[in-house]
Swiss-Prot record:
GO cellular component, one term: mismatch repair complex
Family label: Belongs to the DNA mismatch repair MutL/HexB family.
The protein, known as: DNA mismatch repair protein MutL
Composition bias type Gly residues, residue spans: 382-392
UniProt keyword list: DNA damage, DNA repair
Stretches with biased composition (Low complexity): 366-381
Transmembrane segments: none
GO MF annotations, alphabetized: ATP binding; ATP hydrolysis activity; ATP-dependent DNA damage sensor activity; mismatched DNA binding
Length: 618
């Protein structure tokens, strides 16, 4: 087949594979667009779990008629215009892919009107070339997006959708996360014509507490310790539940936002868990709602297709900052729970929102509001770091950033407070709580060893050895087999008669390890491998594995997993702080026995006493 340029619709459908995972992904992208447009009210109407209809209606600034066609085109956006903008993202969207991708796998209609226009206009794309048709329509100022029959033209994607209830639960979780990020926006969620959730916009701290309680529940609010921690351009705000009273019901409340964007960052999670570990039992997990504000130049959000992850330029600084902030408030937890006497019952989950800390360039003009006075914390659980902690000037949980850099015309006026950060898997798996930890990573020594501090002792940890144990744990099946990842291009290998016999004997065990294959007369075709092997050179690793199996007389999954773990290539020839912290977090979660009883070659204590004695003088 010759090299050729893909048709626009097919190209968009490929992009949709990363952007549009399920109906909840569509809701996330479209609501984020509404928030970037300065909307103060967003109505979300869902039918049949999003498979039949997703309608997002907002009162934002709208889209001009001449820009409607561009809005449905790939890589067309109003959020960035230069590389400088990309390196300092403060809006939720910036790639300009969502609408084009969604319209390629559904029947999408975009209706919008700006305040300057006398009439609204409607646009939709259809056909192989995704030609956009624009026609007049009736609509107030703002935008409505209707997504009908999601995945109607990609049956393979549609068959992977879950039940109506499951898909709607994912959407409900997305809106819940957005509601925690934006207290200043009213969000109404309906399903099959029935209002299910109503999060009303709020401004006052007391109302925000009620909204927090309505979203996260009264048990969380009763144990919530307020955090206000600052150092330079870093600010940490939010709530963490008192670990001494954390219950199983609270462990699913683990929400973290970076510049208003919902994140699933292992570095942040590790810092929080490490701060709480001394107060948590072996079967407990931390519960928190935290907002991290950082200079946009110091964080890269363009590292994940769905923007669920970020990369910090100074990961060690961020980790230690969060650790100290959470630890400080836990040490000052005497009588720090939030007052509940003014909390109104929330019968139908009718919570509220937060105030944006800046004027939106796209927002519809509004009457000037009275100057706001700096908010003062109502609770005694707050802690401030650095220069005493600056009070927020727009109400909780937003603060004016500690940086004032030129961002270009668009960024000077965009919302300085990020908004939603949806996410992860619908009901994201909670962090595993641990009473045991390797300790705190101080630095990387020799490129492949981490210097750790724990309970006043210093130790060196071999990162390659820890990585090998982690791989073995990931490859060893538990109560269920290891999940197999299908290969885009199956690997076909020629095998000898002895190797073929060995493969047939070990086929069931290999299947438990996530390795699936088919064999014929002289060849074997590898069709799936476990996730830890996806980035390996399978053309070298698999023949070596087959040779190993041919030399064995008996087979066991543990032995095979151990052999694979010892023979895979490390993905990190040079380790960074962030990689080391992430690795240890995974090892502590999957291999807690290594913390209690480290095997040989993993940890080596560092004798500081002899060094200190050598420095002493009579």
């Amino acid at each position: 087949m010759p090299i050729q340029v893909l048709p626009p619709q097919l190209a968009n459908q490929i992009a949709a594979g990363e952007v549009v995972e399920r109906p909840a992904s569509v809701v996330k992208e479209l609501v984020e667009n509404s928030l970037d447009a300065g909307a103060t009210r967003v109505d979300i109407d869902i039918e049949r779990g999003g498979a039949k209809l997703i309608r997002i209606r907002d009162n934002g600034c709208g889209i001009k008629k001449e820009e409607l066609a561009l809005a449905l085109a790939r890589h067309a956006t109003s959020k960035i215009a230069s590389l400088d903008d990309l390196e300092a993202i403060i809006s939720l969207g910036f790639r300009g892919e969502a609408l084009a991708s969604i319209s390629s796998v559904s029947r999408l209609t975009l209706t919008s009107r700006t305040a300057e226009q006398a009439e609204a206009w409607q646009a939709y794309a259809e056909g192989r070339d995704m030609d956009v048709t624009v026609k007049p329509a009736a609509h107030p100022v703002g935008t409505t997006l209707e997504v009908l029959d999601l995945f109607y033209n990609t049956p393979a994607r549609r068959k992977f959708m879950r039940t109506e209830k499951t898909e709607f639960n994912h959407i409900d979780e997305i809106i819940r996360r957005i509601a925690l990020a934006r207290f200043d926006v009213t969000l109404n969620l309906s399903h099959n014509g029935k209002l299910v959730r109503q999060y009303r916009a709020v401004a006052k701290d007391g109302q925000k507490e009620r909204r927090l309680g309505a979203i996260c529940g009264t048990p969380f609010l009763e144990q919530a310790l307020a955090i206000e921690w600052q150092h330079g351009d870093l600010t940490l705000r939010g709530w963490v539940a008192d670990p001494n009273h954390t219950t199983t019901a609270l462990t699913e409340i683990q929400y973290c936002y970076v510049n208003g964007r919902m994140m699933r960052d292992r570095l942040i999670n590790h810092a929080i868990r490490q701060a709480c570990e001394d107060k948590l039992g072996a079967d407990q997990q931390p519960a928190f709602v935290l907002y991290l504000e950082i200079d946009p130049h110091q964080v890269d959000v363009n590292v994940h297709p769905a923007k669920h992850e970020v990369r910090f330029h100074q990961s060690r600084l961020v980790h230690d900052f969060i650790y100290q902030g959470v630890l400080s408030v836990l040490q000052q937890q005497t009588e720090t729970t939030l007052p509940l006497e003014d909390i109104a019952p929330a019968p139908r989950h009718v919570p509220e929102n937060r105030i944006a800390a800046g004027r939106n360039h796209f927002a519809v003009p509004a009457e000037p509001t009275a100057a706001r006075e700096p908010a003062t914390p109502r609770y005694s659980g707050g802690a401030s770091g650095g220069n005493g902690g600056r009070q927020s000037a727009g109400g909780w949980p937003h603060a004016q950033p500690g940086y004032q850099k030129q961002q270009g015309e668009v960024y000077r006026t965009l919302l300085q407070t990020p908004a939603t950060s949806p996410a992860p898997e619908p009901v994201a798996p909670a962090l595993d709580g641990h009473s045991q930890s390797f300790g705190r990573v101080l630095t990387i020594v020799g490129g492949d060893c981490a210097l750790l501090e724990h309970a006043g002792t210093i130790q060196l940890l071999s990162l390659p050895v820890a990585e090998r144990w982690l791989r073995q744990a990931q490859l060893t099946p538990g109560q269920s087999p290891v999940c197999a990842q299908p290969l885009l291009i199956p690997l076909r290998l020629k095998v000898s008669a002895d190797e073929k016999v060995a493969l047939q004997k070990a086929q069931s065990l290999l299947g438990e390890l996530g390795i699936e294959f088919q064999s014929d007369a002289q060849h074997v075709t590898i069709r799936a491998v476990p996730l830890p092997l996806r980035q390996q050179n399978l053309q070298i690793l698999i023949p070596e594995l087959i040779g190993y199996l041919a030399q064995q007389t008996t087979f066991a999954t543990v032995n095979i997993a151990q052999w694979i773990a010892r023979n895979v290539q490390s993905e990190h020839p040079q380790w960074s702080m962030a990689q080391a912290i992430s690795l240890l977090a995974d090892v502590e979660r999957l291999c807690p026995q290594l913390v209690k009883a480290p095997p040989g070659g993993l940890l080596q204590p560092v004798d500081l006493h002899s060094a200190m004695n050598a420095l002493k003088h009579e």
